[in-house]
């Protein structure tokens, strides 16, 4: 059994169900039975559609329209895009899947309205096309220009909303920037070993600009840095770098994969999620086997 294939098939399943529910509820306005539940210490209310799609039920102004951001089976669109882009990478760069699956993943990524998700998807598509023998050089240049223009314009709209939307009267971009700076400051104060594995309380106590949860920061990579120091970062990054060096053919795939995983952790606090633990263990297993497998 290929566990990687199973994971990506599950992601595609949720991408399909999320697309159907999103289209029915928010585009076609078809009423679907749902329940409510409350999450976190602030008691944020979520709509639950059969336990496979969650939504807070409010919309944002995107492209001049009121649009709900697609969250899939998660509480946050930014987390959902991580899984979507993970599958997109595999089906574009590794396995060359059918166009329907790729289009489905891109549809969901678009409606997450996640700037980081869009950027990651565009890079994956551009590299996939650049390395594909099916496209002529002229076609590649045209597609690259189109994606760059589309990505730039679309990202501009999303980033504008990031700076204008409020969370306790502060934009999410403001919060992310300050999370990074505070995490960096704590890391500089404790560079070698950090302040302790999974110890996010000092960050929470010094955070005066936002209500911080137990994850400690919106920047997962910086949380690894300030809690475990240089030693922890070496432990996390070493197998990826080693596997890149050991790979002889198509090294760009491993480089892109490494950048993507680091980027995921920069954009969301997913550093200790089982999914990220699986990815880290997989890289160590590959390193110990001294092989150059496909991912």
What annotation goes with each model-predicted range?
Residues 20-29, 112, 129-168:
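A membrane-periplasm/extracellular boundary helix in multi-pass inner-membrane enzymes
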């Amino acid at each position: 059994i290929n566990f990687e294939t199973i994971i990506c098939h599950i992601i595609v399943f949720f991408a399909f169900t999320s697309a159907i529910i999103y289209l029915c509820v928010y585009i076609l306005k078809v009423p679907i039975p749902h329940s409510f539940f409350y999450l976190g210490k602030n008691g944020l209310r979520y709509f639950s559609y059969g336990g496979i799609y969650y939504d807070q039920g409010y919309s944002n102004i995107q492209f001049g329209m009121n649009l709900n951001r697609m969250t899939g089976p998660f509480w946050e669109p930014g987390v959902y895009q991580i899984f979507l882009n993970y599958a997109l990478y595999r089906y574009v760069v590794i396995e060359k899947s059918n166009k329907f699956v790729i289009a489905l993943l891109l549809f969901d990524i678009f409606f997450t309205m996640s700037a980081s998700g869009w950027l990651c998807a565009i890079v994956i598509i551009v590299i996939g096309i650049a390395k594909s023998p099916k496209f002529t050089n002229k076609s590649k240049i045209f597609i690259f220009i189109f994606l760059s223009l589309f990505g730039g314009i679309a990202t501009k709209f999303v980033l504008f909303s990031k700076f204008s939307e409020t969370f306790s009267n502060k934009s999410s971009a403001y919060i992310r920037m300050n999370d990074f700076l505070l995490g960096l400051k704590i890391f500089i104060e404790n560079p070698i070993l950090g302040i302790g594995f999974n110890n996010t309380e000092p960050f929470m106590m010094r955070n005066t600009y936002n209500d911080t949860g137990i994850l400690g920061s919106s920047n997962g990579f910086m949380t690894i840095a300030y809690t475990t120091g240089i030693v922890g970062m070496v432990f996390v990054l070493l197998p990826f770098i080693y596997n890149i060096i050991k790979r002889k053919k198509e090294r760009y795939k491993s480089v892109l994969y490494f950048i993507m995983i680091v980027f995921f952790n920069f954009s969301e606090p997913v550093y200790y999620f089982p999914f990220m633990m699986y990815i880290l263990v997989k890289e160590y297993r590959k390193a110990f086997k001294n092989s150059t497998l496909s991912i």
